Regions:
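Extracytoplasmic/peripheral linker and loop segments enriched in polar/acidic and small residues
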Residues: 431-444, 471-538, 563-564
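Long beta-strand-rich cores associated with HINT superfamily self-processing modules
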Residues: 535-564
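Ligand-site clamp/hinge motif
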Residues: 248-293
């Protein structure tokens, strides 16, 4: 997650190949050129390799940061997933497979892990990757002076939360380098998905000497970042593009077939399609007007994703309550737009209307029931009720006219979504004026973090396979809350779900169902849709692996097949 992975998504938080929509596995970016790709149906791997192993792709947005402690969005995590590696990484079947770690042992109570590291793991400058690199990185992430939005994802590690809140010294973090190649980790509670969690970007190692040498420039340029993954980042020209090149120092470089991956930043969907048709790129996400054209093309396919998009409804701006503090106004907005029209006409890419936060077919209960089926649809479109809430809101606010701002991505597809929502809200809620504010991805993320907006078109993709990756976003003052929403009962449910209920799976599951209903009945956010991707990909492109959590896809196993 992906923030957003979980991650903030790009809009609309997905794909150039991908146009990375920042879901914050993460937050989303709002555009559909996402190259998140699993093999197309029937595609076989293991064919003959082409002489030239170069993949050409696009992204709709610039990389905001290559600092793994500070990254929060889908674009950054996607890049990091391919140039970095944690203790474990997700394999082609989305299962945890050894990365820097060769193996691990877990204590009987599930609260202590001992990882044995691979002595062949090296940084791109030739330095060995050691246990000390993980200790430094993890401490840096939870240090409140780092101001890492994703610090909370490490709160399962002993004392991480207390340290981040300034209530415990940094040296008490439950991570220890027993020797250069043995890492010991202590947890607050048993976490069944902890090994998988170590594949997430915030858990990546960092070379302390290099980070301190680069200072404030670390992670902002290709040559001020150090890599330990399958590729290295080069030729990073901001707002224009970048390259990934095979990392000769990577311990498993024999598996990597691609020599180079070229990314160009292209925000216009029509331009991307033209580049695809002219053979200048090998894969492209499609937006609505191009889907029908390509539906019968053998290069075309669609895929569902566990990412949801919604409107953030900011209740506090500039330290003052906004009109959106009024619950009736939030409910009016959340019920006033045509979700089917949005997904079927404006998007037309396999996305489906969402009356929920936690996506369909994402998480199952201890007895195998889908979370979404159990909790059903919660916040549905109902224009009649929206108007009733609108009248109550105007009365409570003492206003007949209300003007709000909708913060949006600056990609062409996201702009269409923004115009649609503006039209729906102004039509169905007479007296409401919605002013659109389209911003580059990085700036949009900053405005959200600063609570400097009214409405925001946003998305979220999961960071790990559990409903909590969506639900814990909206705790009071949570780093990804970014709405000013606060409900002590909601906070209590989340706290128990991340603590005492971890070993009481049925009770925990029921509490998460309750939390989602509470959040949406409060209209803390206004759901829009669950994202789908429509993609065209050249037949010669093989082996790109799509991940439901963390970085959207991996190129470690990708290659260009010989078409002869």
């Amino acid at each position: 997650m992906k923030r957003k992975k979980m991650k903030k998504l790009t809009a609309v938080v997905a794909p150039v190949l991908v146009m990375s929509m920042a879901l914050t596995a993460c937050s989303g970016s709002g555009e559909k050129d996402k190259a998140s790709t699993t093999p197309k149906s029937g595609e076989k791997e293991g064919g003959k390799l082409a002489a030239k192993q170069v993949l050409n792709l696009t992204e709709a947005q610039e990389i905001p940061s290559m600092d793994s402690s500070k990254a929060t969005d889908q674009v950054s995590f996607l890049a990091l997933n391919n140039v970095m590696e944690g203790l474990y990484r997700l394999d082609k079947d989305n299962k945890a497979t050894p990365g820097v770690a060769e193996s691990y042992k877990k204590s009987d109570d599930g609260k202590k892990y001992t990882f044995t590291l691979n002595k062949n793991a090296k940084w791109s400058n030739g330095d060995p990757v050691t246990a000390k690199d993980f200790v430094y990185s993890w401490k840096r992430a939870v240090d409140k002076n780092t101001a890492a939005e994703y610090a909370y994802i490490m709160f399962d590690v002993k004392n991480a939360k207390a340290i981040n809140e300034g209530k415990a010294p940094l040296d008490t973090l439950g991570v220890k380098a027993v020797d250069d190649y043995t890492l010991e980790v202590e947890l607050e509670n048993p976490v069944p998905y902890f090994v998988e969690l170590t594949s997430f970007g915030t858990f990546y190692p960092l070379n302390e000497k290099f980070v301190k040498e680069k200072g404030e420039k670390f992670g902002l340029e290709a040559d001020t970042t150090l890599y330990n993954g399958p590729f290295t980042l080069t030729d990073w020209k901001h707002e224009e593009g970048w390259k990934l090149k095979k990392n000769a120092q990577y311990w498993d470089n024999k598996t990597v077939k691609l020599e180079e991956i070229n990314f160009n930043v292209v925000k216009d969907s029509g331009t991307r399609v033209n580049l695809y048709e002219s053979g200048q790129i090998d894969r492209s996400g499609l937006v609505s007007e191009f889907v029908d054209k390509y539906k019968s093309n053998p290069d075309f396919y669609t895929q569902k994703t566990p990412s949801t998009f919604f409107l953030r409804l900011n209740q506090k701006r500039g330290g003052q309550d906004t009109v959106l503090k009024n619950k009736d106004l939030r409910l009016a907005i959340a019920k006033a737009y045509d979700k089917k029209g949005l997904t079927n006409v404006i998007l037309n890419d396999g996305s489906t209307p969402a009356d929920y936060l936690v996506p369909k077919e994402f998480a199952k209960s201890p007895d195998g029931k889908d979370f979404r089926k159990e909790n059903g649809d919660i916040l549905k479109t109902d224009v009649k009720k929206a108007k009733e809430h609108w009248e109550k809101a105007k009365k409570d606010l003492g206003k007949e006219q209300v003007t709000i701002e909708l913060l949006n991505y600056d990609s062409d597809n996201a702009k269409k979504v923004g115009e649609f929502l503006k039209g729906e809200l102004e039509k169905n809620l007479p007296g409401l004026t919605v002013n659109l504010k389209n911003q580059p991805f990085k700036q949009k993320l900053k405005l959200e973090s600063d609570l400097d907006y009214d409405l925001s078109y946003a998305g979220w993709g999961p960071d790990y396979l559990d409903p909590m990756t969506f639900i814990d976003m909206f705790v009071t003052d949570g780093p990804h809350n970014q709405t000013g929403y606060s409900n002590p009962k909601y906070d209590e449910i989340v706290a128990k779900g991340k603590g005492e209920l971890l070993t009481k799976t049925k009770e925990r599951w029921d509490s998460l169902l309750k939390a989602e209903k509470m959040l949406l009945e409060d209209a803390a956010i206004a759901p829009l849709y669950q994202r789908g991707d429509a993609i065209v990909q050249k037949a010669k492109v093989k082996g790109i692996v799509h991940h439901p959590v963390g970085g959207d896809y991996s190129y470690k196993w990708a290659y260009i097949g010989d078409e002869k």
